[in-house]
């Protein structure tokens, strides 16, 4: 009698969906509120000079921290409940809705979510005209053999945009156009994420003049605005080279063997779409579409740099672009476009953004569980912030500088706004640095590196999730690639921060 052994199929561990990860983080965050008491800082106004103008910012008073107590003198806790009603603090089951509807039109979550839907719809119209697909085919035909040059050219331009004017959300719009180009060139949509949004964040983090990060942090820390630019420019060059080389190596591997791409299946959308595209002569209508598209991009950059336009204005600019291009498409019958297909294209483009928009709202809800992240608000976050600051105070100055970098990187998971994080952390860490011998310029370096580079992998980064959404890249597929690049940049950041402290950078 022979024994028959049945082989059981091996179960491979699969990375949980991003929503599952966020919900698990929400549970851990809720549990923390049961053991960590609520703390509070008083807020104060600080002034700093930018381009000859006096700016003000609401920040915490580092000497005012206190644990809130009840009438019996015992520490007060804002323990997250399972479910709450009315204007009570959100419970665990409330955090998705509260996160999705929080904020204003100027930021996370509702402002960013509406921004994503509007630009998704606007570019849905642009792509429906067929001009972009037709232009990509023509571009490839005229640059055959030199395709690899697109990657360094785009990467450097986007990194420069992040360094000079804090480019971030704007990269989403460019990614919509560049994604089909990269796939057509034999790369993948992860390459698009790298050359657009990730490049902007490398520039953002290593900038010498970013108005939303380094300028605000220097102003709050009492360091002359735009000082220390020499080292920062060198760091920007090094960081950009690291990111560019990483991207070139990754893109080359994917081009040689497309099956190595983690998004080979999801990129089928772009490949199938391209298979249906037939090369046709460029018409006058196509040229009008490209002229309007280029003009709006210039208009957006001008508005951000000159007038400090932000989410509401940029979204309205892209809506204007979509409307005008849609009218051109209807008038010139581009790709058989009608008024009805113009409307359905807007809806389809917006629909593509729903999944990443949900992630943005859910991530914001996590912050609401521990406090709103605003200077002067009572929250668990303040207690954690003060405790970590006290722990750093007992370290050697070079080690303390490195721990400031690490702390800023972790803290950025909860407060992804560069200026918001500066308002919460710099008033504490700048004077703390004085006590342990860390130069304030180094403290600012630790802040900008920790704040900027960690945007590469945090699902709480609205712009990252939006870029992944338009490129149809699942966060789980992005995480391994992004974490590897972040590791390289964190090593560089650590060397720079410790080296700057030891060399007396100021």
UniProtKB/Swiss-Prot annotation:
Annotated TM spans: 19-39, 107-127, 148-168, 171-191, 208-228, 231-251, 287-307, 310-330, 352-372, 398-418, 419-439, 442-462, 485-505
Q: Which UniProt keywords apply?
A: Antiport, Cell inner membrane, Cell membrane, Membrane, Transmembrane, Transmembrane helix, Transport
Which membrane topology describes this protein? Multi-pass membrane protein
Asked if the Swiss-Prot or TrEMBL record annotates the protein with the keyword Repeat, the reply is no
Could you name the Gene Ontology cellular component terms for this entry?
Answer: plasma membrane
List localization entries: Cell inner membrane
Checking Pfam families in the record gives: DcuC (PF03606)
Q: What is its main location?
A: membrane
Is-annotated flag, keyword Cell membrane?
yes
Which terms in the Gene Ontology molecular function aspect does this entry carry?
A: antiporter activity
- Function summary: Metabolomic profiling of different yfcC over-expression and deletion strains suggests that it may affect the glyoxylate shunt.
Q: Which family does it belong to?
A: To H.influenzae HI_0594.
Q: What is the name attached to this protein's record? A: Putative basic amino acid antiporter YfcC
Native species: Escherichia coli (strain K12)
């Amino acid at each position: 009698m022979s024994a028959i052994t049945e082989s059981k199929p091996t179960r491979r561990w699969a990375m949980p969906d991003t929503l599952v990860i966020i919900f698990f983080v929400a549970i851990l965050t809720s549990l923390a509120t049961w053991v960590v008491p609520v703390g509070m800082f008083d807020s104060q106004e600080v002034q700093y000079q930018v381009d000859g103008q006096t700016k003000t910012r609401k920040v915490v008073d580092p000497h005012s921290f206190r644990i809130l107590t009840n009438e019996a003198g015992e520490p007060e806790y804002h323990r997250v409940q399972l479910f709450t009603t009315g204007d009570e603090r959100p419970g665990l089951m409330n955090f998705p809705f509260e996160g999705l509807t929080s904020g204003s039109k100027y930021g996370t979550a509702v402002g960013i979510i509406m921004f994503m839907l509007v630009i998704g719809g606007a570019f849905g119209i642009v792509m429906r005209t067929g001009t972009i697909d037709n232009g990509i085919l023509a571009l490839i035909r005229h640059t055959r053999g030199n395709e690899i040059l697109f990657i360094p050219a785009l990467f450097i331009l986007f990194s420069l945009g992040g360094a000079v004017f804090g480019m971030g959300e704007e990269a989403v719009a460019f990614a919509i156009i560049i994604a089909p180009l990269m796939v057509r060139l034999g790369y993948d949509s992860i390459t698009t994420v790298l050359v657009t949004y990730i490049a902007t964040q490398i520039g953002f983090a290593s900038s010498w003049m970013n108005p939303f990060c380094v300028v605000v942090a220097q102003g709050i820390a009492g360091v002359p605005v735009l000082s220390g630019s020499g080292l920062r420019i060198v760091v920007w060059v090094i960081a950009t080279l690291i990111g560019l080389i990483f991207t070139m190596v990754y893109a080359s591997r994917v081009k040689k063997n497309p099956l190595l791409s983690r998004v080979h299946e999801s990129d089928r959308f772009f490949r199938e779409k391209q298979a249906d595209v037939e090369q046709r002569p460029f018409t006058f209508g196509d040229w009008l579409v490209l002229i309007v598209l280029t003009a709006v991009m210039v208009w957006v950059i001008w508005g951000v740099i000159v007038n400090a336009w932000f989410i509401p204005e940029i979204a309205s600019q892209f809506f204007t672009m979509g409307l005008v291009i849609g009218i051109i498409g209807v008038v010139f019958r581009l790709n058989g476009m009608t008024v009805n297909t113009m409307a359905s294209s807007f809806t389809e483009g917006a629909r593509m953004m729903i999944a990443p928009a949900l992630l943005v709202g859910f991530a914001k809800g996590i912050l609401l569980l521990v406090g709103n992240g605003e200077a002067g608000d009572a929250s668990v976050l303040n207690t954690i912030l003060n405790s970590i600051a006290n722990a750093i105070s007992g370290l050697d100055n070079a080690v303390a500088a490195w721990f400031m970098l690490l702390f800023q990187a972790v803290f950025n998971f909860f407060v992804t706004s560069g200026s918001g994080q500066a308002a919460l952390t710099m008033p504490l860490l700048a004077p703390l640095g004085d006590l342990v011998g860390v130069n304030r310029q180094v403290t600012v370096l630790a802040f900008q590196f920790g704040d900027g580079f960690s945007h590469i992998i945090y699902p709480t980064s609205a712009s990252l999730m939006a870029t992944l959404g338009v490129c149809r890249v699942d966060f789980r597929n992005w995480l391994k690639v992004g974490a590897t690049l972040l590791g390289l940049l964190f090593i560089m950041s650590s060397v720079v921060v410790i080296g700057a402290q030891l060399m007396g950078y100021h």
